[in-house]
């Protein structure tokens, strides 16, 4: 970075987003002994400890989705979302070329073909007009990324998806708290994916959440 005709030669100071509240919360988990609720008995609260379940409930309530499923990373949440959409060999999934590799790697994981669609020069998100140019009879889903916290034109993307019976997976890793026409990001598609990675807006070191508003998709995901 140039400052008054000089070039900065030292790195910017490293920030620390871990405060007293976070430290207390971790200590409480260690003290209450509920490090896992994997007890070998099936129930609706089989996965995760009480605080994970609390996170899922509060996340779903805040972002106005039916279900929130906590995972170890947003990458895993993307993979689960593609699986819930029943993406498989011979399918095509439309993705943006301007994204993290996980958006494409998940498609390859299921033996499907990623098809790149151009971005909107104003938002750098998927262009609905460009999506229509790459549609084919094999198209199964669309992965739309809310790049830098800015959502794509979801009205138009939903119109295309409904016309062709496609699942929309919204990668909202960079966009918790954003809104599109009054609606929260992460709840704009059929499945939304959030990241809790250390470099994201809300973090726990590592983690991810899949937000689902369609019950039949959650059944596949879990």
Map each language-model feature to its residues.
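PLP-dependent aminotransferase-like
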Residues: 83-172, 179
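Conserved SAM-binding loop
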Residues: 70, 95, 210
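Conserved core segment of the aminotransferase class I/II
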Residues: 198-218
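Conserved PLP-binding active-site segment in aminotransferase class I/II-type PLP enzymes
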Residues: 4-75, 79-84, 88, 109, ...
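Conserved small/polar residues in nucleotide/adenosyl-binding loops
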Residues: 1-5, 215-222
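Conserved active-site segment immediately N-terminal to the catalytic lysine
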Residues: 170-204
């Amino acid at each position: 970075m140039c400052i008054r005709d000089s070039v900065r030669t030292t790195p910017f100071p490293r920030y620390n987003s871990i405060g007293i509240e976070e430290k207390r919360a971790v200590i409480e988990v260690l003290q209450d002994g509920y490090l896992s609720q994997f007890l070998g008995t099936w129930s609706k609260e089989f996965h995760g400890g009480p605080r994970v379940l609390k996170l899922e409930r509060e996340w779903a309530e805040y972002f106005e989705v039916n279900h929130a499923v906590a995972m170890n990373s947003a990458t895993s949440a993307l993979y689960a979302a593609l699986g819930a959409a029943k993406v498989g060999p011979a399918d095509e999934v439309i993705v943006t070329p301007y994204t993290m590799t996980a958006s494409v790697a998940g498609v390859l994981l299921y033996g499907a073909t990623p098809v790149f669609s151009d971005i909107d020069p104003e938002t750098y998100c998927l262009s609905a007009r460009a999506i229509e140019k790459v549609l084919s009879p094999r198209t199964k889903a669309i992965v739309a990324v809310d790049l830098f916290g800015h959502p794509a034109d979801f009205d138009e993307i939903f119109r295309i998806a409904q016309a062709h019976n496609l699942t929309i997976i919204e990668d909202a890793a960079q966009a918790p708290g954003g809104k599109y026409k009054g609606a929260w990001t992460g709840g704009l598609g059929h499945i939304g994916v959030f990241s809790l990675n250390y470099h994201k807006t809300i973090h726990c070191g590592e983690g991810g959440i899949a937000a689902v508003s369609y019950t039949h998709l959650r059944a596949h995901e879990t």
